[in-house]
């Protein structure tokens, strides 16, 4: 199990080191438009899971949405502090 901050640190490191075969690197290379489409897709899956699936499945979908949001943040050069400032 990892925290939101730990995930962001891990993804930031992957963005920096660009390991071969990394899903994160592939998404970053695809660009903001492709990542944004994935965020929208995952948000819809969260909604559907919340409506029709178990808490476990909903939590899994939320974790995937958070992952893609963080990848989008990295693609835009945003830090956690940039977002926290608006919470």
From Swiss-Prot:
Presence of the UniProt keyword Transferase in the record: no
EC number, UniProt record: 3.6.1.31
Localization: Cytoplasm
Keywords: Amino-acid biosynthesis, ATP-binding, Cytoplasm, Histidine biosynthesis, Hydrolase, Nucleotide-binding
Pathway: Amino-acid biosynthesis; L-histidine biosynthesis; L-histidine from 5-phospho-alpha-D-ribose 1-diphosphate: step 2/9
GO cellular component terms, semicolon-separated: cytoplasm
Domain of life, source organism: Bacteria
Predominant location: cytoplasm
GO molecular function, one term: phosphoribosyl-ATP diphosphatase activity
Enzyme class: hydrolase
Catalyzed reactions per annotation: 1-(5-phospho-beta-D-ribosyl)-ATP + H2O = 1-(5-phospho-beta-D-ribosyl)-5'-AMP + diphosphate + H(+)
InterPro entries for the chain: HisE, PRib-ATP_PPHydrolase-like
GO biological process: L-histidine biosynthetic process
PANTHER family: HISTIDINE BIOSYNTHESIS BIFUNCTIONAL PROTEIN, HISTIDINE BIOSYNTHESIS BIFUNCTIONAL PROTEIN HIS7
Family, similarity comment: Belongs to the PRA-PH family.
Listed name of the protein: Phosphoribosyl-ATP pyrophosphatase
Species lineage: Bacteria, Bacillati, Actinomycetota, Actinomycetes, Streptosporangiales
């Amino acid at each position: 199990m990892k925290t939101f901050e730990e995930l962001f640190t891990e993804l930031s490191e992957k963005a920096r080191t660009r390991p071969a075969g990394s899903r994160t690197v592939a998404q970053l290379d695809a660009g903001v438009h492709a990542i944004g489409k994935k965020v929208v897709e995952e948000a819809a899956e969260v909604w559907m899971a919340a409506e029709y699936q178990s808490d476990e499945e909903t939590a899994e979908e939320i974790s995937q949405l958070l992952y893609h949001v963080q990848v989008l943040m990295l693609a835009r050069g945003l830090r956690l502090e940039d977002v926290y400032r608006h919470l």
